[in-house]
Swiss-Prot record:
Binds 1 Mg(2+) ion per subunit. Substrate binds at V305, T306, T307, G308, R309, K310, R311. It comes from Saccharomyces cerevisiae (strain RM11-1a) (Baker's yeast). Keywords: Cytoplasm, GTP-binding, Ligase, Magnesium, Metal-binding, Nucleotide-binding, Purine biosynthesis. It comes from the Eukaryota. Mg(2+) binds at D12, G39. Homodimer. One of its GO terms (molecular function) is adenylosuccinate synthase activity. It catalyses: IMP + L-aspartate + GTP = N(6)-(1,2-dicarboxyethyl)-AMP + GDP + phosphate + 2 H(+). This is Adenylosuccinate synthetase. Its cofactor is Mg(2+). Its EC number is 6.3.4.4. InterPro entries: Adenylosuccin_syn_GTP-bd, Adenylosuccin_syn_Lys_AS, Adenylosuccinate_synth_dom1, Adenylosuccinate_synth_dom2, Adenylosuccinate_synth_dom3, Adenylosuccinate_synthetase, P-loop_NTPase. IMP binds at D12, E13, G14, K15, N37, A38, G39, H40, T134, R148, N230, T245, R309.
Length: 433
């Protein structure tokens, strides 16, 4: 059994909380894409654990965790995050954590060039806007992967004669191509290979052939949960390109990032914030640059875990959600942070786009069009009631249930979970047929 948790908007929907809720039922939690460029916090027994690269399944002492071949790994950050979690009391994490031998490596010079590239792009653009990268080197690493010049985990841990010398030579060539492209930036070449020679010994016990790992688990009928990173609207192919991340963050990335066939997937859970947020630049049709946006940001505490940046806020965009559903094929939804809407008298939701009076059939791929669309809203009544103490779906205010029902009917997917507060237990389950 393989079930998948995916973000349906622009990230920060609360995927980690759903994974945290579900993880006790699973034998394995796997990540399939991205790196340490996103983050979420899980609270267990009053202890806060911040996850950026590592799978959230580490909070379950009986769960194995895998970083798949589609993940890109900055090895120093891998160990720093692991040590931070261990310092907070996470037990036997090292024996339950595995890394794909096919995963690509992020180096410090990738991070340097990530920031240089961002400055370059903002200087070229007419409005001075940039992509909004986290500066973690994710994009440049995927670039070297696509150009077939990158280094993978197996290159680092290979014990064969001459393998280390080959690693250093390839590392040097990779660095030189960056310098040719961006000029002679400050970087201690001599120190870095020496650092990685130490890290390779530390990393070896974690490394597995992830294809064998996953298929053995599937054959053994293990319960597997895939933890998606980022969200569909940040997908390199289907998101608001170029204001996207550098990997496939939808269901396609699950298959290629873990090496599993489509027939192994059972349930696909789409996580949807009850309103919409976005970090960084790029079109955002339902954004509210007014008191409503500020209110959503304040009540929702909308600041990024990884970057600390303020998130832009707006109303729920059902055009985005329907498009996301078409691609990812959600079998049920988790609506998060519904409580943030508690004090709004009226709650608009975006239901269609038009441009120059002509309604669009679907979410447009052209950002010149997307940036000019007019949004048609359906205004739904608020419930003006604190829902954070409610423990059963049936006890939600009628208008809150109507809000959820409207979402279900619009996208044709049932809501299975509803987030009603920041606490770990503030998640209502609704039976679905």
């Amino acid at each position: 059994m393989v079930n998948v948790v995916l973000g349906s908007q622009w990230g920060d929907e609360g995927k980690g909380k759903l994974v945290d809720l579900l993880v006790g039922k699973y034998d394995i939690v796997a990540r399939c894409a991205g790196g340490n460029n996103a983050g979420h916090t899980i609270v267990v027994n009053g202890v806060k654990y911040d996850f950026h690269m590592l799978p959230s399944g580490l909070v379950n002492p009986n769960c194995q965790n895998l970083l798949g071949n589609g993940v890109v790994i900055h090895v120093p950050s891998f160990f720093k995050e692991l040590e931070t979690l261990e310092a907070k009391g996470l037990k036997n994490a090292r024996s339950r954590l595995f890394v794909s031998s096919r995963a690509h490596l992020v180096f410090d010079f990738h991070q340097v060039t990530d920031k240089l590239r961002e400055l370059e792009l903002s200087g070229r653009s007419k409005d001075g806007k940039n992509i909004g990268t986290t500066g973690k080197g994710i994009g440049p690493t995927y670039s070297t992967k696509a150009s077939r010049s990158g280094l993978r985990v197996h290159h680092l841990v290979n014990d064969q004669p001459g393998a280390w010398e080959e690693f250093v030579a390839r590392y040097k060539r990779l660095l030189e191509t960056r310098r040719q492209r961006y000029g002679d930036f400050e970087y201690d070449f001599e120190a870095k290979p020496a650092e990685y020679k130490k890290l390779r010994e530390q990393l070896k016990p974690f490394v597995v052939d992830s294809v064998v790992f996953m298929h053995n688990a599937i054959e053994a009928k293990k319960k597997i949960l895939v933890e998606g990173a980022n969200a569909l609207m940040l997908d390199i192919d289907f998101g608001t390109y170029p204001y996207v991340t550098s990997s496939n963050t939808g269901i396609g990335g699950v298959l290629t990032g873990l090496g599993i066939p489509p027939r192994t997937i059972d349930e696909i859970y789409g996580v949807v914030k009850a309103y919409t947020t976005r970090v960084g630049e790029g079109p955002f049709p339902t954004e509210q640059l007014n008191e409503n946006g500020e209110k959503l940001q304040t009540i929702g505490a909308e600041f990024g875990v990884t970057t600390g940046r303020k998130r832009r806020c707006g109303w729920l965009d059902l055009v985005v959600l329907k498009y996301s559903t078409l691609i990812n094929g959600y079998t049920s939804l988790n609506i998060t942070k519904l409580d943030v809407l508690d004090t709004f008298k009226e709650i608009p939701v975006g239901i269609s786009y038009s441009i120059q009076g002509k309604k669009l059939d679907l979410f447009p791929e052209d950002l010149n069009i997307l940036g000019k669309v007019e949004v048609e809203y359906k205004v739904l009544p608020g419930w003006d009631q604190d829902i954070t103490k409610i423990t059963k779906y049936e006890d939600l205010p009628e208008n809150a249930k109507k809000y959820l029902k409207y979402i279900e009917d619009f996208v044709g997917v049932p809501v299975e979970w509803v987030g009603t507060g920041p606490a770990r237990e503030s998640m209502l389950h609704k039976e679905i047929k």
